[in-house]
Amino acid sequence: MCAALRRNLLLRSLWVVLAIGTAQVQAASPRWEPQIAVLCEAGQIYQPQYLSEEGRWVTDLSKKTTGPTCLRDKMDLLDYCKKAYPNRDITNIVESSHYQKIGGWCRQGALNAAKCKGSHRWIKPFRCLGPFQSDALLVPEGCLFDHIHNASRCWPFVRWNQTGAAACQERGMQMRSFAMLLPCGISVFSGVEFVCCPKHFKTDEIHVKKTDLPVMPAAQINSANDELVMNDEDDSNDSNYSKDANEDDLDDEDDLMGDDEEDDMVADEAATAGGSPNTGSSGDSNSGSLDDINAEYDSGEEGDNYEEDGAGSESEAEVEASWDQSGGAKVVSLKSDSSSPSSAPVAPAPEKAPVKSESVTSTPQLSASAAAFVAANSGNSGTGAGAPPSTAQPTSDPYFTHFDPHYEHQSYKVSQKRLEESHREKVTRVMKDWSDLEEKYQDMRLADPKAAQSFKQRMTARFQTSVQALEEEGNAEKHQLAAMHQQRVLAHINQRKREAMTCYTQALTEQPPNAHHVEKCLQKLLRALHKDRAHALAHYRHLLNSGGPGGLEAAASERPRTLERLIDIDRAVNQSMTMLKRYPELSAKIAQLMNDYILALRSKDDIPGSSLGMSEEAEAGILDKYRVEIERKVAEKERLRLAEKQRKEQRAAEREKLREEKLRLEAKKVDDMLKSQVAEQQSQPTQSSTQSQAQQQQQEKSLPGKELGPDAALVTAANPNLETTKSEKDLSDTEYGEATVSSTKVQTVLPTVDDDAVQRAVEDVAAAVAHQEAEPQVQHFMTHDLGHRESSFSLRREFAQHAHAAKEGRNVYFTLSFAGIALMAAVFVGVAVAKWRTSRSPHAQGFIEVDQNVTTHHPIVREEKIVPNMQINGYENPTYKYFEVKE
């Protein structure tokens, strides 16, 4: 009976084995269920397909999509599910766990679906779920059923797949099948249920054809041409319409609160980092776990920030397939988040199927921690002797798993700050590693310079690579964050438009029509359309402001799409007013009021009055006005930049000129100093020779005075003017002789020469010269001016002695000063020590030590000796305090 039951279980679980598309896990349910499939290929746009109740994939060309590109956004996928299955209550979607081969793809614009004969593709479809849908999992004999539920975790399909695989791996088992638990958002859930089986569980091996296709490749969503279907009442199954006037007023106040903050949102859009156009993978990083960052971030709906156009889907797991050299089996290393909830660690699971056809069994993928655990504790792994390589990656930011449209703006801002801090920490780690390598290089250079130089080259190359990788990673993360924010803002705007249109159409069809309800719903629709318009204009202005000529080029390429989007919004406004005109009574009451309301909304955009009209020319004029303003700002910035550059060059030239002038003055000063030194050196020999001549003359003049004796000296002293008279007489004789010689020379020129006169003149001159040389000269300060102006030898000796005495006096002064200061310091220190000791004594504190031996007649015990010391420190007997309190 047990064998029959086992066979029955194996037959019932055959559909599970057939769904092994990725060699990891099986699907949960083979029965028919609503599903849609989307094919996204570069350069090709295909219509999505849905699974009919007959089990065939069908393309319905009448069901329009929300954009010109393939469906990537979760909200768009959910909307298409609702369109494909209008009779079902579709509230959520989830990615299928296996691939299906689907053909008959129709390109966008095809007119007949029967003629579409596109080649078959392996696609992973999306399941359209109801309010709550739990899959039944088969539990074969020897396997275990378990589930993980954490209300604080709102994770996508892939993340819970990893969590279940890790939980099975901890038990030494492998995950056989799994299913999602309670949903907490669009395509995000708060738990997983799974079945774990032994690693060597016997099951039939099946050859499965697998193709490596991404589920949702990262790309920008061009939402510029979001189409508002005005007359399709099947777009949504909920309505904000209420027949209660109070509820309408509350909804209206909420929308007005959002619109009042719209200017702040648009202004903040320019200051927000738009990210880099790079959409490549962000590379490896080592940030902390998601468990460390688990806060709820709040922000109002009015804080929707209009960022740059283009949005990316949620962070998906990117896998790398590689061949294990030891065993030849294929292993997978993840470039995705790896986090562990409180119940179990997370192990990666594949998102892409391998390319080659091969016989596979259900072997779970291993994360870095799980692989290390298996390598250490189990030696018979199915993938070979060694653990598969895995790349450690940071956990995803909570922003990607927590979404509330009312708090989207604040969550985005907090996530931006968190991303900047994480990037700053990574840069700090890289710089620290660089410092360590630099120290190592300095040590190596002392031992082996050649090896050190080679090491430095490798080190520099690796550092440059690391810095570049960090920059690319940071740009990719910023772009991913901005793209997700853009996606959520656009989805929220579209949701508001759909809800407002549903409310408006229901209010118009109400019998009898309620003018107040129609007015409120139409105002809500007009505000939603205006918000979409403000978003388009803000994005266009952001492109203009994003980077000078490059931003202008990007805005020029985006202008046609922006203009078309504005025209579509104007067309929707006109259609809504046309719908109102079909009801003359309502139109007569509120038509003029609604027209004024439209103009009031348009006036909030800082648009000239001539451009408020809803026409293509007016919209083009608005875009041209923005472009002209930005071009004027760019030209002004360029002019200011050139002027600043010229000022800097002028200041640099002035500084250079001042520097040259300073150098010239310094050179001139040095030249003057050198010239003065040379002049002093040349004057020193002249002065010494002059002094020696003066000394010789003084000695010669002193000799005649000594020969005359004391009598002559007395005569000279008695008649001091005698020498002066003689010198004047000698000077007159000399002048007379010179005059005679000169007259004689003049007479020689005459034709007649008197020889006798010449002879007499010569004799007179010779006699005068002989008489002048024989007569001694008197020492006089006018005669020897140079000798009297120079210092004598005795004065120089006296100056040297005076300088030596002054130097000795200064030394004595310094010694006495130092001794006095030291003595004063010693006195102060002694006084301070004495005061400190005095203050520490009990007598100074008002206590008097009592001799216990004198006052008492009984011997003193040890405790009683301690009591006085305790009382000094403030001790009070508790017995006394007790009686005092009692009294």
UniProtKB/Swiss-Prot annotation:
> Any one cellular component term from GO for this entry?
axon
Gene3D superfamilies named among the record's database cross-references = Amyloid precursor protein, E2 domain (1.20.120.770), Amyloidogenic glycoprotein, copper-binding domain (3.30.1490.140), Amyloidogenic glycoprotein, heparin-binding domain (3.90.570.10)
- Intervals, Extracellular compartment: 28-813
How does gene deletion manifest?
Answer: Overexpression inhibits the Nedd8 conjugation pathway, disrupts the normal bristle pattern in the fly thorax, and induces apoptosis in wing imaginal disks.
Q: Which Gene Ontology biological process is one annotated for this entry?
A: axonogenesis
Q: What does this protein do?
A: During development, plays a role in the regulation of the neddylation pathway. Appl and APP-BP1 interact antagonistically during development.
Protein name, UniProt field: Amyloid-beta-like protein
The organism encoding this protein is: Drosophila melanogaster
Originating gene: Appl
